[in-house]
Amino acid sequence: AVLLFGTPEDGKKDERGTPASSPSSAVARAVEALKQRAGDEIVVITDVCLCAYTSHGHCGVLRDGKVINDETLPLLKDIALAHAGAGADVVAPSDMMDGRVAAIRKGLDEANYEDVGILSYAAKYASAYYGPFRDAAESTPSTGDRKAYQMDPANVREAIREAHLDEQEGADMLMVKPALAYLDVIRAVRQETRLPLATYNVSGEYSAVKAAAARGWLDEATVVRENLVGMTRAGADLIITYHSREALERGWL
């Protein structure tokens, strides 16, 4: 399986992130290419969010410095529909707007995409570990931060509540993000749901291992295995990680 993210062409960002829902977006084109080449041999998951496409870098419609939750939901639904139309097997909303799973599920069903699954970022924390990805995707907020809609790192009860809500709204899989500093959250959510549970071994976690290995401070293969085993032991059924290709090619797993 692969999880696809996209960025618009230079100068194409706008206040509402409209390039994200274009049928000719980078993500839609990548989905079509992968499906034409590999068909059902690969599960294609697509990220559904606005932050890489908005001129302000926030994950929703911004007005007077505040993200407007309900006005964002139709935009997220449109992104999911564009990805489903391109052939995505699963859409993965990462925005953390309230009610987005229900809005996306309703939109998919009404468009006859009942078989397209939803992997919900149920517990996405306002973490400093996202830094390298935000630099690469040029999605750092131009003003403020995302603490108003992403979760407080000190709060595990909210993760359980969000997992229950997303399951009730129609999510097929749930996710905890990041992974290594949140193994207790993975365990807590695992004990509350029978849905498949994913975790995201994010860019900062990956970069820390790579940087330490480059300096000879640790054995990369052993540490990668240990980290992935820890996530699995905590209860993750699926792991999204930047280590995957190298780990497979080098036989680390």
Predicted regions: what they are:
Residues 1-253:
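Alpha/beta enzyme core
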